[in-house]
Amino acid sequence: MIHKTQKFNMKSERRAYREIYAFYFFCLFLKKVIKKLLTFCYWIRNIIFNKFEIWLRKRVFYMGIEYREERSGSKIQIFSYCDEKKTGAICALSDGYDWALICDVWADKAETEKKLIREMILKLQGQEIFVTATPDKLDLYEEIGFRRSKNSFTYVGKVLSDAQEKELTESGLYLPIGYRYETEFEPLTGMFPVGKKSDKQKFKVFYSDKSDRADYHQVNALLEKAFGGKRNEYVTKDTFSKSQYVQYAYDNETLIGCARAISDGAHALILNVAVDPDYQGLHLGWNIVDKLSRQMKDQNIFLNTHPGGVGFYNQKGFRRNKTALLLPAHEMPDEIKKGFCLPRGYRFSDESLKVQKTP
C-alpha cells in the first residue's frame, strides 16, 4: 500500500518532468523563432547597408559620378553624370598601343575634372599620354603625375606676321621660334638619333597618301632601321592601316620615308615620322610631315619628337608647345628623362606660379 505522501511526491515528480520537457521544447521553439528572427534582421540589415553603401559611394566617394564611355575610330570619350545630369566630359585620341593625346576636358567642378582625367588614364594604361594644358592647369596635371614636355610641337603651317607671332607667344601656350632650353646645350650620350646628310644625288622621290599600296613589311623594316630595335610587324600594320592619315615616300619601289596621324576631325596626333638613314638630310622628313599635315586642314595638329629631332621642327611651320605635358607609360632613366621632360614644378619667369627648378 502506497502512502499518500509518496503518491503526492510521485505526482509532483511527474509534474516536474512534464514542466522540464515543456520548458525544453519551448526553448527549442524559441531558438527556432530567434534564429528566424535573426535571419530576417540580417536580411533587412543587408538591404539597408547595401543601399546605404551605394548611396554613400555615390554621394561621398564618387560625388554621384557615373562614367559612360564612347569610342569612334581613334577617338575615346568619357562622360560623367550625376543623377542623369551631365557634369563633365573628356576626349582623347589613341592608337590603341603606344600613344595617346588628351584633347579636351570639361567639368563643372575641379574634383570632377580630376576624376575624369584619372578615369581616362586608366583607359589609356600602358600608353604614352600627352596633353596641352592652359597655364592655370599645370598644377592639376603635375599632381596627377604628368611632367612638362620639352619636345612637343603644334603645326601652324604658314608664315605669320610679326603681330601674329607676338600674339601667339603672348598666349602663354607657345615658345618663340628657335627657343632652346638651357639643358639642351648640355651634351647628351648619343642615345638620341640625329641623322647625317646623305650623299645620294640621283634618285626620284614619289609621295603617296594611300594605304592600299603600302607594304607593311617594308614599313616595319624602315621603322627598325630609323629608330633601332625590333618592332612587332602586326602592331605596325594595325596602327598604320587604322590611322586616318598616312604619308609615304618612295624611291622607285623602295620605301624611304613614312608618317601617320590619328585624328577625330578637330584634333590630330602625328606619329612614326621616319626617314631611311641613307636618305636623311635631303628634306624628305620635312616634305613628308608637311604633306601629311596639309591633309588635316584646319585641325589642331600635335606631335612629339626625341631630343635629336628638336632642331628639325623648331622652325617656321611649327611652334614649340610651352604647356604640353607627358605621362610616361614607364619610368624613364634620369638621362633620358632629362631629354624629354622638364624638372617637376618647373615654371617660366612669366608664369604666375613660383619658379621651381628642382626635381
Model-predicted segments: where are they?
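A conserved beta-strand-loop-helix scaffold within acyl/acetyltransferase catalytic domains
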Residues: G73-W106, R231-A274
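Conserved acetyl-CoA-binding loop of GNAT-fold acetyltransferases
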Residues: E143-N151, K316-T323
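Conserved acetyl-CoA pyrophosphate-binding loop and the N-cap/start of the following alpha-helix
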Residues: K109-M120, D278-I288
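Short amphipathic alpha-helix that is part of the acyltransferase structural core
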Residues: N50-Y81, S152, Q164-Y234, A324, ...
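Conserved GNAT acetyl-CoA-binding A-motif
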Residues: L124-P135, R294-P307
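Short, positively charged and aromatic/hydrophobic N-terminal segments
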Residues: F29, K35, T39-Y42, N46-E53
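Short hydrophobic alpha-helical segments enriched in small aliphatic residues
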Residues: K4, M10-E13, A22
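Acidic/histidine-enriched, beta-strand-rich ligand/metal-binding domains
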Residues: C103-D104, L140, L271-N272, D278-G281, ...
